[in-house]
């Protein structure tokens, strides 16, 4: 529960469960009304809702595979992507109806896996079922990662101009994770340039960029994953 006057400006909620499983966010309340209620409750509390949309991983058939392969499998499956794009459309319909500011953090991790599977950091070289789904906002768009990004932006523009659209820049998408490699400043600039080039290859513009530090804290990785303390930050990390 939020206490009035506590000073927080945002609260966030993951939308998950897969687009074709029958247990995704759209089923949490009838016909996607979970988003409607969450936005309304946020506005009443004086905070901006942030939704992290994490649906491709748990969709079928890729959910049974390891995460990188499962994401790729789902992105290239026409039936899966049709249900997925319909699900994204439902979100924008619900969020757009509110008229208040909503932040949509679109698919953390997806872009990192796609970048690693692309040629020369070019999202247009990675196949994604987009136009071939015949989903109305995807018609005529290329069957690649750029087509996916362009479709999501087009949906937002048409259905929910009040939604701030967030791109997730996975800093490990280059294949090198700076959290572990401790790169020099020069090397870090090279990696950043590659991440920027991948984003630019998508041929459209999001509004804000999200980036992770870690998905677990350093002590968890040391004692549960047994990484020997490699995840702890030092003075060179910032």
Residue locations for each model-derived region?
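An active-site-proximal structural segment forming one wall of the substrate-binding cleft
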Residues: 70-106, 136, 140-159, 188-205
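Short, surface-exposed basic-aromatic patches at helix termini and helix-loop junctions that form
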Residues: 2-6, 40-43, 96, 119-126, ...
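N-terminal carbohydrate-binding/catalytic regions of secreted carbohydrate-active enzymes
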Residues: 1-94, 231-237
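Surface-exposed substrate-engagement region within the catalytic domains
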Residues: 3, 24-27, 143-238
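Solvent-exposed loop/turn segments at secondary-structure junctions
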Residues: 16-20, 55-59, 108-113, 170-175, ...
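Structural preference for beta-strand elements that scaffold enzyme active sites
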Residues: 8-12, 46-50, 101-105, 162-166, ...
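Active-site groove signature of glycoside hydrolases
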Residues: 91-138, 163-169
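A solvent-exposed, charged loop/short amphipathic helix patch at secondary-structure junctions
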Residues: 62-79, 117-146, 223-237
């Amino acid at each position: 529960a939020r206490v009035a006057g506590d000073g927080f400006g945002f609260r966030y909620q993951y939308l998950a469960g897969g687009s074709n499983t029958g247990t995704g966010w759209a089923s949490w309340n009838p016909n996607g009304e979970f988003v409607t209620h969450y936005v309304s409750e946020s506005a009443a509390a004086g905070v901006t809702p942030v939704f992290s949309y994490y649906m491709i991983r748990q969709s079928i058939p890729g959910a049974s595979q390891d995460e990188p392969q499962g994401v790729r499998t789902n992105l290239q499956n026409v039936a899966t992507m049709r249900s997925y794009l319909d699900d994204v459309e439902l979100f924008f319909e619900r969020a757009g109806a509110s008229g208040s500011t909503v932040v949509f953090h679109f698919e953390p991790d997806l872009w990192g896996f796609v970048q690693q599977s692309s040629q020369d950091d070019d999202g247009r070289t990675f196949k994604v079922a987009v136009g071939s789904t015949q989903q109305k906002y995807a018609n005529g768009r290329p069957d690649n990662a750029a087509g996916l990004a362009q479709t999501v932006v087009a949906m937002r523009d048409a259905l929910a101009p009040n939604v701030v659209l967030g791109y997730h820049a996975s800093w490990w998408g280059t294949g090198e994770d700076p959290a572990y490699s401790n790169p020099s400043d020069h090397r870090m600039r090279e990696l950043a340039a590659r991440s920027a080039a991948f984003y630019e290859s998508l041929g459209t513009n999001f509004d804000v960029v999200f980036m992770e530090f870690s998905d677990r804290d350093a002590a968890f990785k040391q004692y549960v994953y047994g990484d020997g303390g490699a995840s702890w930050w030092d003075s060179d990390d910032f």
